[in-house]
Amino acid sequence: MNEIHKTAIISPKAEIDKEVVIGPYCIIGDNVKIGRGTRLINHVQIEGITEIGQNCTIFPFTTIGFPPQDIKYKGEPTGVKIGNNNTIREYVTIHRASVAGDGWTVIGDSNFIMAYVHIAHDCKIGNSVIMANLATLAGHVQVEDFAFIGGLVAIHQFTRIGAYAMIGGFSGVGQDVPPFTMASGPRAKLYGLNSVGLKRRGFSDETINILKKAYKILFRDKLQLKEAIDKVKKELPQIPEIIHLLEFIEANKRGICR
């Protein structure tokens, strides 16, 4: 049975699943869907075409599904999709998509999004991502699984953050950050492999050592990027992590942090 506070304002057109808790002064718009077991603490406002999965917890003064901060947007039917088991802390803003992408801002499963984070239109967030306080993602940013984004980080539009990457606090990121690496700085640069994070996630010593060798060839041997990629393909075992790393780099459009 749902637990809905008497001060909450919920559109009769909204689709609220079973066992949802909606606390005081929450506002839920017409085209909102909320999955089983999700909890809105209080003062949460959800608008637009927004789908929220199961067992999410959303804290006070978070807003989801409002129009994108894009002057080209004229009210087209775009939306937000949020998966299961996400924690979204106080004052987070998650905007619906613009018309320049596929029409959705997407957040996957099991993410931890800390207070005052901004996720702009058309962003694609994977699974098990951690975003610390006041991290800001511009439009069309992509963040792969298990990435960590530090506090007060600003990420330029269309930039990609690779899986298991770590971005240090106060950084400005304007180029793609490769998977498994660490980046930091006002114009973010790479500072090595995220070895500690990889060990915590259960990567074997053998895999980490292969990634370290790839990192050295790609980012420290002062080779042209294509030459470095060819050398990694020729000299190192093509384990899944190496394949993903190289495919990510080869797909870049904004350049790669080095």
Curated annotation (Swiss-Prot):
Pathway it works in: Glycolipid biosynthesis; lipid IV(A) biosynthesis; lipid IV(A) from (3R)-3-hydroxytetradecanoyl-[acyl-carrier-protein] and UDP-N-acetyl-alpha-D-glucosamine: step 1/6
One annotated GO biological process: lipid A biosynthetic process
Catalytic activity line of the entry: a (3R)-hydroxyacyl-[ACP] + UDP-N-acetyl-alpha-D-glucosamine = a UDP-3-O-[(3R)-3-hydroxyacyl]-N-acetyl-alpha-D-glucosamine + holo-[ACP]
Entry protein name: Acyl-[acyl-carrier-protein]--UDP-N-acetylglucosamine O-acyltransferase
GO molecular function: acyl-[acyl-carrier-protein]-UDP-N-acetylglucosamine O-acyltransferase activity
HAMAP family: LpxA
Gene name, Swiss-Prot/TrEMBL: lpxA
Protein's organism: Thermodesulfovibrio yellowstonii (strain ATCC 51303 / DSM 11347 / YP87)
Keywords noted in UniProt: Acyltransferase, Cytoplasm, Lipid A biosynthesis, Lipid biosynthesis, Lipid metabolism, Repeat, Transferase
Subcellular location(s) of the protein: Cytoplasm
SUPFAM superfamilies documented for this protein: Trimeric LpxA-like enzymes
Enzyme class: transferase
Assembly and oligomerization: Homotrimer.
Gene Ontology CC annotation, any one: membrane
